[in-house]
């Protein structure tokens, strides 16, 4: 082996096997691109992304760790979400969750109060 050499294993790596998934249609209603990382609690993404936020509670993008999805202004695209593992204790950067994802009504109420598009669809 050469120092620094990477020798990936052959074959396909499966991620998030056995976890519940959902597809959601997301529209960027803002005037700037928005990028969302792989493990960001999806209900807490930028308030200018419009989608059914209730469907995103306890979910993150079903993409490889360390990657992201970019939404251009005016763009609409379907993404797949996957549930978080473990005890579903999530602390989002917009303080909608702050702990358990099992308090859906409280999380949605905070999203509505904060002007997050798509939260009012509950």
Curated annotation (Swiss-Prot):
UniProt KW Nuclease keyword: no
Gene3D superfamilies reported in the protein's UniProt record: Urease, beta subunit (2.10.150.10)
Pathway: Nitrogen metabolism; urea degradation; CO(2) and NH(3) from urea (urease route): step 1/1
Record InterPro entries: Urease_beta-like, Urease_betasu_sf, Urease_subunit
Record bears the keyword Hydrolase: yes
Disulfide bonds: none
UniProt GO cellular component terms: urease complex
Stated family: Belongs to the urease beta subunit family.
Assembly behavior: Heterotrimer of UreA (gamma), UreB (beta) and UreC (alpha) subunits. Three heterotrimers associate to form the active enzyme.
Identification of the protein by name: Urease subunit beta
Native source organism of the sequence: Lysinibacillus sphaericus (strain C3-41)
